[in-house]
Amino acid sequence: MHFETVIGLEVHVELKTDSKMFSPSPAHFGAEPNSNTNVIDLAYPGVLPVVNRRAVDWAMRASMALNMDIATNSKFDRKNYFYPDNPKAYQISQFDQPIGENGYIDIEVDGETKRIGITRLHMEEDAGKSTHKDGYSLVDLNRQGTPLIEIVSEPDIRSPKEAYAYLEKLRSIIQYTGVSDCKMEEGSLRCDANISLRPYGQKEFGTKTELKNLNSFNYVKKGLEYEEKRQEEELLNGGEIGQETRRFDESTGKTILMRVKEGSDDYRYFPEPDIVPLYVDEDWKARVRETIPELPDERKAKYVNDLGLPEYDAHVLTLTKEMSDFFEGAIDHGADVKLTSNWLMGGVNEYLNKNQVELKDTQLTPENLAGMIKLIEDGTMSSKIAKKVFPELAENGGDAKQIMEDKGLVQISDEATLLKFVTDALDNNPQSIEDYKNGKGKAMGFLVGQIMKASKGQANPQKVNSLLKQELDNR
């Protein structure tokens, strides 16, 4: 028997507002524990929540960017549960009247485009954070009340690979809207996954399992791959899948049972009595719609159709707004489009990955990178020299030409000097001359390599090729 995998994702995104969802406390990451709190966050008796208007605007902006319908009538509800980092013993969320419904995004997997439906987007407040260490439980309520949106996909995803592509695309769109930075390492984007299997051709869904502790897109993919295999083996052996919540263990790559899954009845939802229902008229919707910036698909189309970039380059450059903005800034400073694309996808990305930093953490600017690329383009700097200059540019900033001169890496373009390197290479490699005469193309490349080695990579490669060909033809 063969099974079809059915996956749905629930993504929590922290909104990048200055204050919390229902209180004026700061909503910034990284403060001292319990310093960003007030009487509302601590659930003092008698205090009343006040809705953050900007959070509502941004939830609407995100919904619109995800092609969703905005509800004219929406409301908040209480989700009741007890936990030490939830001082009210309930969370203010939205149950049956979310702010956004019926959206979609298009993903690309193996060259094919697929549309993934989005059921709903609703607003809620985050809980605090509990840390368990050495027999003690520590509670930090800084995060309590931080504005969240939860984005719930339709069960349209059919593989862990599609789930990864969906998350990449979703993060990209949300980042472009400016409502969140979507940093998983800081908790501003979190994902839970629901997965079930059913025999091919069966319409009814199988029993789903929820996966938690998925701290990166890669772990989402790995957790789903393991669970897909586990459920298939269980079903083939005649077993049954329970409705469970399971935790992904990063060290073993396996999922571990946490608890039997609760249903919505367990939370005893009821309308929040301290907040009036939201009425979103057409004027409000129109004002928010005007704030939606250019989104990744629009930029990608522009890069392909207007700038002539390959589809792959355009896809990589538009994955994050930071990289896309940097690319546009560099070409605005006169850098060649394709050379800039190659450097951002190659040397720049390698540097960022190696040092585990983001563009904003470096001293790179669109202007100084464009300056280096223009030197490469006009032949002043070889690619080999550029690779030696670039780390200094990224770490300390400055001017690429000045760095090149300070390091004694100025490219040799003087013909007399280059001719000496050429003749030395020919005199030392008579067999290569013979090979060239006999039509062996590799001989030319070998000789160029010898010249570049002798000049420590500083010889102008274009002039070397020209002079070498002349000398070979004359011998």
Swiss-Prot record:
Signal sequence range: none
Source organism superkingdom: Bacteria
SMART domains: GatB_Yqey (SM00845)
Substrates-to-products reaction catalysed: L-glutamyl-tRNA(Gln) + L-glutamine + ATP + H2O = L-glutaminyl-tRNA(Gln) + L-glutamate + ADP + phosphate + H(+); L-aspartyl-tRNA(Asn) + L-glutamine + ATP + H2O = L-asparaginyl-tRNA(Asn) + L-glutamate + ADP + phosphate + 2 H(+)
GO biological process, one term: translation
InterPro entries: Asn/Gln-tRNA_amidoTrfase_suB/E, Asn/Gln-tRNA_Trfase_suB/E_cat, Asn/Gln_amidotransferase, Asn/Gln_tRNA_amidoTrase-B-like, GatB, GatB_C_1, GatB_Yqey_C_2, Gln-tRNA_amidoTrfase_suB_CS
EC number: 6.3.5.-
Keywords carried by this UniProt record: ATP-binding, Ligase, Nucleotide-binding, Protein biosynthesis
EC category: ligase
Protein family (similarity comment): Belongs to the GatB/GatE family. GatB subfamily.
Assembly description: Heterotrimer of A, B and C subunits.
Function: Allows the formation of correctly charged Asn-tRNA(Asn) or Gln-tRNA(Gln) through the transamidation of misacylated Asp-tRNA(Asn) or Glu-tRNA(Gln) in organisms which lack either or both of asparaginyl-tRNA or glutaminyl-tRNA synthetases. The reaction takes place in the presence of glutamine and ATP through an activated phospho-Asp-tRNA(Asn) or phospho-Glu-tRNA(Gln).
Descriptive protein name: Aspartyl/glutamyl-tRNA(Asn/Gln) amidotransferase subunit B
